[in-house]
A protein has these predicted regions:
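Short, flexible turn/loop "capping" segments at secondary-structure junctions
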Residues: 1-7, 54-57
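Active-site-flanking beta-strand signature of metal-NTP-handling nucleotidyl enzymes
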Residues: 6-14, 62
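Beta-strand elements of well-folded, non-transmembrane domains
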Residues: 13-17, 69
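Short, surface-exposed ligand-recognition loops at beta-strand->loop->(often short) alpha-helix junctions
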Residues: 16-27
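An amphipathic, aromatic/His-enriched active-site/gating alpha helix that lines ligand/cofactor pockets
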Residues: 30-46, 56-57, 64-104, 111
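Short, solvent-exposed loop/turn elements at beta->coil junctions and helix N-caps
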Residues: 49-53
Length: 111
């Protein structure tokens, strides 16, 4: 985790089928770099796309964003809303159940 980050969002997306999960993954793989380039300008310090693999029979992806300030979080949310509007049809086809959390970093230990 970036030492400058003091806020983060961690979202888990659960899908009914592997095909839906793979569609969602492709959407982020195709658009994630361009989106992060925009978010960096707003104060987002990290974007991480993950596939959860240790839960047999489930299809899950998680997304982590870290921000350097509360204002960076707010500005990034506006950019994320614009991003999702542009790809809403694809996102709806993936039909994820979303569990979103907003976090304040309390302790961050690293090697």
């Amino acid at each position: 985790m970036d030492t400058k980050a003091n806020l983060m969002t961690y979202n888990t997306f659960t899908f009914k089928t592997e095909a839906q999960m793979l569609l969602f993954r492709r959407i982020w793989e195709d658009n994630g770099t361009a989106l992060f380039d925009k978010l960096k300008k707003k104060g987002c310090t990290r974007f991480c796309l993950n596939q959860i693999w240790n839960m047999k029979g489930t299809f899950k992806i998680s997304v982590l964003f870290e921000y350097d300030s509360p204002n960076a979080f707010k500005q990034s949310q506006i950019e994320l809303e614009n991003f999702t509007k542009n790809i809403m049809k694809e996102l709806q086809a993936a039909d994820p159940v979303i569990e979103a959390s907003r976090n304040i970093v309390l302790q961050d230990l690293k090697v």
